């Protein structure tokens, strides 16, 4: 850049020197300053010596350098010629243009002097004629002005004589403002001539004014009159020099009492908003409550304006009244939003309140009502957002609890499916609707809403976070997993149906997978950003954390459902094993009734999970022995078939027990309790595992004789087939059933199992009896 700037500076310098040499009268003057310090090789100096320069160049340079210098000087000479030509042409064009301009100016000025002379003559002629007219009309003008003054005086005199009659007409028509204006206009004359020429007029006028003063005082203290009318009466009394300072306390007290009529009470707010909307569509809206309220507030503001002028020392009390009106407006708004209010109704009532604030602020700007209202509006808006989320949570809770979930309907019908679908719709549609209402808050054009846009977005994010956390806590309370201080909906945990717990678990999964992502999209699209002030008491919306919360809640609720169902079966088993004396048990003749009840409970679990949970991939797991060959899970049953018929019962029992324990050593390890998945098969399998584990523990607490042990053997053998059909992990079920038999044998005084033919006969008899019972039930 520096190498390019140097030639430009040299060229500009050369152009300046050319201009100076062209216009300077003496060329020596323009170059005298530079010739002092010029060297002998400066070709542009006046003291340049060509011969000396050439001698120096020949001595210092070779032929190649001389040729280059020759070419360079030829180019410079050519450039100088070109620049000089351009300079001459440009100045020549300017001279021609200036000449043309001078010619036009001369042509325009030509003839102007004659026109100016004619104009001067005409002006002198007009002036002389005007002087003549003034001289001729001077005497008549004085007479006309005298008559005009006389006429005005007569009109004033006539007005004074007509004043009593005018005042009486004003009294009849209650035009007290005109009466005061007439009387104050006539006062200067009445003061001067009231005791002489206009004595009667003055007396009659004063009598009329006394009546007017009484009427104005009556209006001033009348409760039926509007605030504005009373303020006008006070102004008129002050114009009549009536002392009103003594009335100040009563007037301000009445003004304070009028605040009650200006409040927007919660029971009237909805009607006020509806009438305000409908009044915009009608031509005559004088009778609408919104219009009436607007007129009342406007009258109140005008009264404050008048009282401020009448009583200058009462400003502080007027400020207090205006602030009280504003504060009461927002207090009633907070009461109004405690019930369910739509965003449109809330905005409607907020606009009315804000219009009142703006109107009062115009009258009393020193009261700083805008700042006070802005703080109150922040509190009200924040409460409204929180109330919206609270109402949504209540809707979801009502949807879950409005169905009377009893045992029969939950199992035989599809009530759980209906409850789940209704609650899912309530959550998804409810969140969609609430964010549509919140969008109206951001779209509102009222000034305070525009200023608080970031705050509103922050409150919505914070409210969403708190809503989902509160909803998760409520789910746990509704399920009986956690307790509540007020015992939700009057239901104790022992009366909560297990089906509701299952619905809550699946609903938590739905919220995690569907609702929270949609809410995240809504917030990102319309409510992003936010003010840090909105997050001062907690974090903003964190979808990842909420998903983890509901994922954990769904697992807790699903496990709670399994525990509830298992506990019911456990109670059944406890009654079964504590009732008889197992040491004196009789010989088994049939499968015990508790087995039917146990299977019935498992059937109910299966029907419930089919309504709520999806079906998983059904895989049955087989166990293998140490050699890898498939075996049945009950090694003890195999040994029964392989025993020799010649053995005695005692020897057979001891050998069978020994082989059972020996087979356990070679069995492959079976995982009994695995993670519960949200599938029908997983829930049923886990429930069966826990029930069998409870059965095993109850067996270990008893002591059996031979018949008692055989009864346990018969019951367990009957359970094998239906349980394997219901679960997906046959290996674990076989293992647990074997464990029950082993536990019974360990607690038996005389371990002699039933023969397989007898077992089969008793089981077949039970199956036939159950089939007959089912047929009779269907036919009936």
Swiss-Prot record:
GO terms for cellular component: cytosol; EARP complex; GARP complex; recycling endosome. The keyword Acetylation applies. The modification N-acetylalanine is found at residue 2. Disruption phenotype: Leaf vascular tissue patterning defects: simpler leaf venation with distal non-meeting of the secondary veins and fewer higher order veins, a narrower leaf with prominent serrations, and reduced root and shoot growth. Normal early endocytic events, but disrupted cellular trafficking. Reduced vacuolar targeting resulting in expanded expression of PIN1 in leaf margins and altered expression pattern of PIN1 and ATHB8 in secondary veins. Residues 270-292, 615-651 are annotated as: Disordered. It comes from the Eukaryota. Keywords: Acetylation, Endosome, Golgi apparatus, Lipid transport, Protein transport, Transport. Its main location: Golgi. It is found in: Golgi apparatus, trans-Golgi network; Recycling endosome; Prevacuolar compartment. Residues 626-639 have a biased composition (Low complexity). It holds the Pfam family VPS51_Exo84_N. Expressed in primary and lateral roots, shoots of seedlings and flowers. The keyword Acetylation applies. Residues 273-284 have a biased composition (Acidic residues). One of its GO terms (biological process) is retrograde transport, endosome to Golgi. Belongs to the VPS51 family. Component of the Golgi-associated retrograde protein (GARP) complex, composed by VPS51, VPS52, VPS53 and VPS54. Component of the endosome-associated retrograde protein (EARP) complex, composed of VPS51, VPS52, VPS53 and VPS50. Interacts with VPS52. Acts as a component of the GARP complex that is involved in retrograde transport from early and late endosomes to the trans-Golgi network (TGN). The GARP complex is required for the maintenance of protein retrieval from endosomes to the TGN, acid hydrolase sorting, lysosome function, endosomal cholesterol traffic and autophagy. VPS51 participates in retrograde transport of acid hydrolase receptors, likely by promoting tethering and SNARE-dependent fusion of endosome-derived carriers to the TGN. Acts as a component of the EARP complex that is involved in endocytic recycling. This is Vacuolar protein sorting-associated protein 51 homolog. It comes from Arabidopsis thaliana. The lineage of its organism: Eukaryota, Viridiplantae, Streptophyta, Embryophyta, Tracheophyta. The gene is VPS51.
């Amino acid at each position: 850049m520096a190498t390019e700037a140097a030639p430009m500076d040299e060229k500009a310098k050369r152009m300046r020197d050319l201009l100076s040499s062209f216009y300077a009268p003496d060329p020596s003057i323009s170059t005298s300053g530079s010739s002092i310090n010029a060297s002998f090789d400066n070709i542009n100096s006046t003291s340049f010596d060509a011969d000396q320069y050439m001698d120096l160049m020949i001595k210092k340079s070779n032929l190649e350098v001389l040729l280059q210098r020759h070419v360079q000087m030829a180019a410079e000479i050519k450039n100088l010629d070109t620049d000089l030509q351009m300079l001459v042409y440009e100045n020549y064009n300017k001279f021609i243009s200036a000449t043309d301009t001078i010619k036009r100016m001369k042509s325009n000025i030509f003839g102007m002097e004659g026109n100016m002379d004619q104009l001067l003559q005409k002006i002198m002629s007009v002036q002389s004629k005007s002087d003549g007219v003034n001289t001729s009309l001077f005497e008549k003008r004085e007479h006309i002005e005298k008559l005009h003054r006389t006429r005005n005086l007569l009109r004033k005199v006539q007005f004074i004589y007509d004043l009593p009659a005018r005042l009486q007409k004003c009294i009849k028509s209650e035009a007290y403002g005109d009466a005061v204006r007439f009387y104050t206009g006539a006062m200067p004359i009445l003061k001067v001539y009231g005791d002489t020429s206009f004595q009667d007029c003055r007396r009659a006028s004063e009598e009329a004014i006394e009546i007017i003063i009484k009427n104005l005082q009556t209006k001033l203290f009348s409760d039926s009159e509007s605030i504005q009318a009373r303020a006008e009466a006070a102004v008129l009394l002050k114009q009549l020099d009536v002392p009103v300072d003594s009335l100040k306390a009563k007037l301000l007290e009445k003004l304070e009492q009028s605040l009650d009529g200006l409040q927007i009470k919660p029971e009237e707010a909805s009607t006020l908003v509806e009438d305000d909307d409908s009044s915009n569509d009608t031509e005559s809206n004088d009778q609408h409550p919104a219009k009436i309220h607007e007129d009342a507030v406007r009258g109140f503001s005008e009264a404050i304006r008048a009282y401020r002028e009448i009583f200058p020392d009462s400003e502080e009390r007027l400020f207090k009244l205006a602030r009280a009106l504003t504060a009461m407006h927002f207090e009633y708004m907070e009461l109004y939003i405690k019930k369910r209010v739509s965003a449109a109704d809330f905005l409607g009532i907020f606009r009315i309140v804000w219009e009142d604030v703006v109107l009062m602020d115009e009258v009393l700007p020193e009261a700083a009502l805008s700042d006070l209202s802005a703080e109150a509006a922040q509190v009200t808006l924040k409460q409204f957002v929180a109330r919206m989320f609270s109402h949504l949570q209540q809707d979801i809770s009502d949807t879950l609890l409005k169905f009377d979930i009893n045992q029969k309907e939950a199992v035989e019908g599809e009530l759980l499916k209906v409850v789940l679908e209704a609650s899912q719709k309530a959550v998804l549609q409810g969140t969609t609707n609430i964010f549509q209402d919140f969008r109206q808050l951001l779209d509102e054009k009222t000034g305070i809403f525009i200023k608080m846009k970031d705050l509103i977005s922050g409150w919505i994010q914070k409210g969403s976070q708190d809503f989902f956390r509160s909803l998760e806590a409520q789910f746990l309370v509704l399920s009986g997993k956690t307790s509540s201080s007020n015992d939700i909906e009057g239901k104790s945990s022992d009366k909560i149906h297990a089906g509701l717990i299952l619905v809550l678990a699946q609903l938590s999964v739905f919220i995690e997978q569907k609702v929270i992502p949609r809410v995240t999209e809504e917030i990102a699209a319309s409510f992003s950003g936010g003010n840090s002030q909105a997050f001062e008491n907690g974090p903003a919306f964190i979808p990842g954390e909420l998903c983890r919360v509901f994922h954990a809640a769904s697992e807790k609720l699903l496990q709670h459902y399994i525990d509830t169902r298992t506990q019911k079966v456990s109670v059944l088993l406890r009654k079964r094993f504590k009732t008889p004396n197992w040491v004196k048990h009789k010989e088994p003749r049939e499968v015990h009734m508790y087995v039917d009840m146990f299977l019935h409970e498992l059937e109910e679990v299966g029907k419930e999970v089919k309504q709520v949970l999806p079906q998983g991939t059904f895989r049955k797991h087989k166990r293998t022995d140490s050699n890898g060959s498939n075996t049945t899970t009950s090694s003890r049953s195999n040994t029964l078939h392989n025993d020799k018929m010649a053995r005695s019962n005692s020897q057979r029992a001891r050998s069978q027990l020994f082989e059972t324990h020996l087979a356990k050593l070679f069995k492959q390890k079976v995982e009994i309790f695995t993670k519960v998945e949200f599938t029908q098969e997983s829930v049923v399998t886990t429930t069966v595992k826990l029930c069998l584990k409870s059965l095993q523990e109850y067996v270990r607490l008893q002591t059996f004789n031979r018949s008692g042990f055989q009864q346990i053997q018969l019951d367990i053998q009957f359970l094998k087939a239906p349980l394997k059909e219901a679960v997906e992990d046959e290996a674990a079920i076989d293992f647990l059933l074997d464990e029950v038999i082993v536990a019974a044998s360990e607690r038996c005084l005389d371990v002699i199992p039933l023969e397989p033919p007898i077992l089969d006969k008793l089981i077949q008899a039970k199956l036939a009896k159950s089939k007959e019972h089912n047929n009779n039930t269907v036919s009936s």
